[in-house]
A protein has these predicted regions:
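Short, Lys/Arg-enriched, disordered terminal segments
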Residues: 1-12, 183-193
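Acidic, metal-coordinating catalytic segment for phosphate/diphosphate chemistry
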Residues: 2-46, 50-52
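Short glycine-enriched loop/turn motifs at secondary-structure junctions
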Residues: 10, 73-74, 140-144
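Nudix hydrolase/Nudix homology domain
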Residues: 33, 82, 109-114, 121-193
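A short, polar/proline- and glycine-enriched secondary-structure boundary/capping micro-motif
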Residues: 37-39, 67-72, 149-152
């Protein structure tokens, strides 16, 4: 699993989509402003990709990230840009971060959450969660990702229980997937539940 180029795929000044509690678009604001203090509710997505062994691809966030640097997180998470469909944004980001394209993503659910990181800033997101499968090589972007690995679900459960170096949204999403979307999850992991 080689590192991809050092292509810059986002900036603090990019315009994110502000939403209300029903995910209706209500405006736009720069990424840096959306993440200040308690954060401003904005649209986001998270992706969970499994290989043919039922192992989840997870990433360690870059040391350059302002929020939760060097924490383990799900396969990919980001924001659609102004005027961009959420599924198009998810596919764009998979290619930009991991060199993955041409796969099918299944929509699971949407939820909102707020989480603060030290006194640096917060996520305050209306997040759509997708699941899918991956076969083939993954080439990650070193500006976005420190490292990647595949992990089986049982090991992930143990690590999340013992270690605090997992992003809060990853923990929330994983719990919801197991508890409320086990039928969909079973298609991808086959053996573990």
């Amino acid at each position: 699993m080689e590192r991809n180029s050092n292509k810059i795929v986002s900036s603090d000044n990019e315009s994110l989509i502000l939403v209300d509690k029903e995910d209706n678009e209500i405006g736009h604001l720069s990424k840096v402003e959306c993440h200040k203090n308690e954060g401003v509710l904005h649209r986001a997505f998270s992706i969970f990709l499994f290989n043919d062994k039922g192992h989840l691809l997870i990433q360690k966030r870059s040391s350059q990230k302002k929020l939760w640097p060097l924490y383990w997180s799900n396969t990919c998470c980001s924001h659609p840009r102004e005027g961009e469909d959420i599924l198009d944004a998810a596919m764009r980001r998979l290619e930009d971060e991991l060199g993955i394209n041409g796969i099918h993503l299944e929509y699971l659910y949407k939820f909102s959450y707020q989480a603060s990181y030290k006194d640096i800033g917060s996520e305050n997101e209306m997040c759509s969660v997708f699941i899918g499968s991956i076969n083939g090589d993954v080439i990650f972007n070193k500006n976005e990702i420190e490292s990647i690995r595949f992990i089986d679900c049982e090991s992930l459960e143990q690590e999340m229980h013992l270690n605090s170096d997992y992003t809060p949204w990853f923990k929330m999403e994983w719990r919801a997937i197991k508890e409320k979307h086990s039928m969909e999850l079973e298609k991808y992991i086959k053996a573990f539940l």
